[in-house]
């Protein structure tokens, strides 16, 4: 399947959104917990529609991993007496809106990070977000870890991936070398364009994004190997909603045990992730332990 590439950005606007998120959480976070949701009969989830392969639009119709999983979540919720309402928002401001209590949860492909864990708990992860790299197809200069020494790398400015670049630096230090020039971009499509034209030697992104890039542009790029410890994608839940977190943990257990989660992972991400944590991620310390940081 071909689909449009998301320009989901981690620009200054995204940094501002995170700052707003942190401030909003400290002042006004009052998202409904499960008892309140059941009382009003509906859970409102914030999603986006420009982040393939999670949520995106093809010919005016929603597609993606979360489009299908939302159907399962709706059925699971109805069995417990309430409905699910979807609100589509741009990524910028989505987490801030959830933190401020305007929506009950973010139902999108959010990476677990230290900053976000200070505002949210995360339901059990639905995908790996370990960091891999893409290189130009046929570039035989890069074959192993040592061959990354001194090479120019591209990442998105302000991203979780940039924040974990020291892990690659530590790996390369064992080969008595370091990363080369680090180029920061406002969006990944810009970085991929510079990789294609030779300005970069490789680009680091989360595993699913690299898989999606190679799936849709395999004539230009190929997948490298992991350059970080484990990483995770999950749904952010306000910390003041522990019952909702428990509800979503139960939902994840159901789709995991039934094989539905693995089937959707294979379909949309190109591989299943049987070794993901099965518990919610609720603290920076727990995240670092799970990720081997």
Where are these regions (language model features)?
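Periplasmic-binding protein-like
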Residues: 49, 127-135, 207, 214-253, ...
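Acidic, polar ligand-binding/catalytic clefts
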Residues: 71, 75, 83-147, 221-222, ...
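Extracytoplasmic small-molecule ligand-binding "clamshell" domains
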Residues: 32-108, 118, 184, 247-248, ...
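Ligand-binding cleft/hinge of the Venus flytrap
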Residues: 56, 71-83, 161-184, 214-218
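Extended ligand-binding regions for polar small-molecule ligands
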Residues: 64-78, 139, 143-147, 151-160, ...
């Amino acid at each position: 399947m071909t689909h449009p590439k998301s320009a989901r950005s981690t620009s200054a606007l995204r940094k501002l959104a995170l700052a707003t998120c942190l401030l909003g959480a400290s002042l006004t976070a009052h998202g409904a917990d499960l008892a309140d949701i059941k009382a009003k009969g509906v859970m409102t989830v914030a999603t986006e529609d420009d982040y393939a392969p999670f949520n995106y639009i093809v010919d005016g119709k929603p597609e993606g991993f979360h489009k299908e999983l939302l159907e399962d979540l709706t059925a699971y919720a109805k069995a417990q007496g309430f409905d699910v309402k979807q609100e589509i928002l741009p990524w910028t401001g989505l987490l801030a809106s959830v933190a401020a209590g305007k929506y009950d949860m973010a139902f999108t492909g959010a990476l677990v990070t230290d900053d976000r864990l200070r505002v949210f708990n995360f339901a059990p992860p639905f995908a790996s977000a370990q960091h891999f790299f893409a290189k130009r197809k046929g570039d035989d200069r890069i074959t192993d870890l040592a061959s990354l020494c001194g090479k120019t790398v591209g990442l998105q400015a302000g991203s979780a991936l940039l924040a974990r670049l020291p892990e690659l630096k530590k790996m390369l230090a064992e080969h008595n070398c370091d990363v080369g020039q680090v180029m920061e971009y406002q969006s990944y499509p810009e970085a991929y364009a510079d990789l294609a034209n030779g300005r970069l030697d490789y680009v680091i992104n989360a595993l699913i994004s690299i898989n999606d890039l190679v799936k849709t542009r395999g004539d230009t790029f190929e997948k490298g190997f992991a350059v970080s410890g484990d990483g995770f994608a999950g749904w952010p839940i306000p910390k003041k909603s522990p019952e909702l977190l428990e509800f979503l943990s139960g939902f994840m257990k159901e789709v995991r045990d039934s094989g539905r989660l693995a089937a959707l992972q294979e379909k949309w991400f190109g591989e299943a992730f049987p070794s993901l944590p099965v518990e919610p991620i609720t603290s920076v310390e727990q995240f670092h332990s799970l990720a081997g940081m």
